[in-house]
Amino acid sequence: MYAVIRTGGKQYRVAQGDRVKIEKLAGDVGGKVNFDVLLVGGEGEAKVGKPTLAGVTVEGEIVAQGKHKKVIHFRKKKEGWTKKRGHRQPYTEVLITTVRA
């Protein structure tokens, strides 16, 4: 059984036992989180919410808080002017513990 959850303005397809890196959530390592479920499916059938499904829960456990690899943004003009900026996006790694339909 799988589910499509929404968190941090993005959607993720998850199943029980998956580890997912999502946008940073407030919480400590070992804490529990619940997600909005948009779709649940398995064995050739799917239920779609309008916009979310009532009675369906996806629970996860926070495994780690970290930062992604650095992304470098570099701009250069013809006159010799340059600008270099870096950014590391924070993330939360979550272990999906249960998907209940």
Swiss-Prot record:
It comes from the Bacteria. One of its GO terms (biological process) is translation. The keyword rRNA-binding applies. Keywords: Ribonucleoprotein, Ribosomal protein, RNA-binding, rRNA-binding. InterPro entries: bL21-like, bL21-like_sf, Ribosomal_bL21. One of its GO terms (molecular function) is rRNA binding. GO terms for cellular component: cytoplasm; ribonucleoprotein complex; ribosome. This protein binds to 23S rRNA in the presence of protein L20. PANTHER family: 50S RIBOSOMAL PROTEIN L21, LARGE RIBOSOMAL SUBUNIT PROTEIN BL21M. Belongs to the bacterial ribosomal protein bL21 family. This is Large ribosomal subunit protein bL21. It comes from Anaeromyxobacter dehalogenans (strain 2CP-C). The gene is rplU.
